[in-house]
């Protein structure tokens, strides 16, 4: 178990056969290749996908991104799931002076309370091993805290302290770690309501909400749907090396569907 925690793919109990070893090796290679392929695809998506649309809302968002890219201000992006919050955050990073540095995402909604601080701050172990958290991995770059409303309430005070001091300690660590990051947060919930209900710290909210961006569902800007269809047909065809699919943009279902996620 300790070996796997430190990075081993699998352990084999004695006695073992040649076939079993080959099977584990093949599975490890397959896992490695899948991760490599995933990284390549994500890198292509990061550098190729654009914020598509001609609606007044998208034009406004593009202008805001242009302004924010020239600053290091914290940004809070609000909007329903699937409205493009991560894409906006990536565009701000890509157009900023930090574009050559890491863009790290930590999704608060996917983490349990006990593991959140470990994922954010990292952890030190008695044997000297270090598990680096999102803050350190994002140093000099941009950290996106996705679904920031889901940060455990007890952890919110520690996040606030990092924003004030620009330093933190790893779990089980005694040394202060200084970081230089741009923080972007996103949420699909109303943080003002959570503050009123004492579910989110008001002081942290104001620290995060320096430059707010509001995004709406695609259902409120249906004039962008034909452009998005055209764009994604071309991009996905290019990435996957397949012929562009035929899609009838006159189909009413495209404009009445609520496009969740």
Pin down the residues of each PLM region:
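CheY-like receiver
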Residues: 2-6, 18-34, 40, 63, ...
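Conserved AAA+/SF3 P-loop NTPase catalytic/coupling segment centered on the Walker-B
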Residues: 75, 91, 113-118, 130-166, ...
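Flexible nucleotide-interacting loop at or near the entrance of a catalytic core
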Residues: 18-80
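Nucleotide-binding/hydrolysis machinery
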Residues: 19, 23-29, 54-57, 70, ...
């Amino acid at each position: 178990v300790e070996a796997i925690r430190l990075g081993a793919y699998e352990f084999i109990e004695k006695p073992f056969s040649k076939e079993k070893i080959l099977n584990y090796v093949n599975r490890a290679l397959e896992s490695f290749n899948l991760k490599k392929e995933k990284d390549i695809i994500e890198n292509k998506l990061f550098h190729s996908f654009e914020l598509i649309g001609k609606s007044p809302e998208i034009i406004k968002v593009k202008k805001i991104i242009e302004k924010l890219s020239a600053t290091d201000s914290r940004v809070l992006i609000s909007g329903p799931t699937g409205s493009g919050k991560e894409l906006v955050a990536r565009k701000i990073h890509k157009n900023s002076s930090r574009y050559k540095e890491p863009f790290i995402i930590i999704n608060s909604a996917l983490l349990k309370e006990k593991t959140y601080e470990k994922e954010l701050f990292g952890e030190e172990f008695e044997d000297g091993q270090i598990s680096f958290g999102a803050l350190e991995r994002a140093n000099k770059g941009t950290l996106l805290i996705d679904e920031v409303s889901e940060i455990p309430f007890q952890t919110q005070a520690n996040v606030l302290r990092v924003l004030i001091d620009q330093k933190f300690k790893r779990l089980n660590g005694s040394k202060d770690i200084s970081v230089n990051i741009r923080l972007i947060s996103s949420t699909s919930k109303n943080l003002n309501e959570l503050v009123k209900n004492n579910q989110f710290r008001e002081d942290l909210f104001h620290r995060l909400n320096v430059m707010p961006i509001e995004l709406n569902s695609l259902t409120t800007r249906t004039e962008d749907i034909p452009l998005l269809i055209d764009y994604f047909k071309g991009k996905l065809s290019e990435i996957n090396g397949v012929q562009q699919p035929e899609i009838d943009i006159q189909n009413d279902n495209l404009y009445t569907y609520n496009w969740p996620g």
